[in-house]
Curated annotation (Swiss-Prot):
This is Probable phosphatase Sbal_1472. SUPFAM superfamilies: PHP domain-like (SSF89550). It holds the Pfam family PHP. Its cofactor is Zn(2+). It comes from Shewanella baltica (strain OS155 / ATCC BAA-1091).
């Protein structure tokens, strides 16, 4: 099954990634990806792009060769209050805001602190998707996080990269997250967390977990471009309005 949406990618603007926007578009066309989000790391990361990078994302075209591009960020959760490293009206210029824990910005501490920080991020209203919440370096109260995400309409990510090149040992946590999401009605999304274009749309390990717990396809944001765009519009991203008509006739892949 080929999903047509990938919400989590990094370009050479984050210097530990290796592909350009052009590279991603080329691979998207090859793989049948119709919509992807450009979500480079937030400015608090040492090798992240400058703040101006995110302000100027508006120069990216909406569609190139039939592939839609979302202008976004993977922000960093900075503290227990759930603050992130992007702010104010600038957030409104973005189509999609991801956020997660990253060791160089917010070192791991303990389960209670991680849980409070993640839930406060969810409650802030600034973040659409929590990235790699299954990271074993940051244990959380999974049920509490899933309940909060369901209540505030924030999606939790099943991060495919966590099973391949980073965050080793995430499988059990991600399975528990998927089960809790199924129970509490939490929205899930699969993210490739691609740092090279060849990984775009690579969801095999994440999909195996989704299938294992029989998570409802109707709540999975990857099911169609229109599903993701409707989610973002409902969360107040007026910037996606010009993309919505371009995908109005799409069909869910599952």
């Amino acid at each position: 099954m080929q999903y047509q949406v990938d919400t989590h990618t990094h370009t050479v603007a984050s210097s530990h990634a290796y592909s350009t926007i052009h590279d991603y578009i080329a691979v998207a066309k090859q793989k049948g990806i119709r919509l992807f989000a450009n979500t480079d790391h937030g400015p608090a990361m040492a090798d992240a792009p400058h703040f101006w990078h995110f302000v100027n994302l508006r120069v990216l075209p909406r569609m190139v060769d039939g592939v839609g591009i979302l202008r976004g960020i993977e922000a960093n959760i900075k503290n227990i209050d759930g603050e992130i490293d992007f702010f104010g009206d600038y957030l409104k210029q973005l189509d999609i805001v991801l956020a997660g824990f990253h060791e160089p910005v917010y070192p791991p501490s303990d389960k209670a602190t991680h849980t409070e920080a993640m839930i406060n991020t969810i409650k802030s209203g600034k973040v659409d998707i929590i990235t790699h919440p299954g990271n074993p370096a940051y244990p959380i109260d999974i049920e509490a996080v899933a309940r909060a995400a369901a209540e505030y309409g924030v999606a939790l990510e099943i991060n495919n990269s966590s099973f391949e090149v980073s965050r080793k040992g995430s499988e059990a946590n991600c399975t528990a997250i998927a089960k809790a999401a199924k129970e509490f009605g939490t929205i899930l999304v699969m993210g490739s967390d691609s740092h090279v274009a060849f990984s775009l749309g690579g969801f095999a390990r994440a999909q195996a977990i989704i299938d294992e717990v029989a998570y409802p396809p109707s709540r999975l944001l990857n099911r169609s471009p229109s599903a993701l765009l409707a989610f973002l519009a409902a969360r107040g991203h007026e910037t996606v309005a010009d993309l919505i008509p371009l995908f109005s006739d799409d069909e869910p892949c599952c």
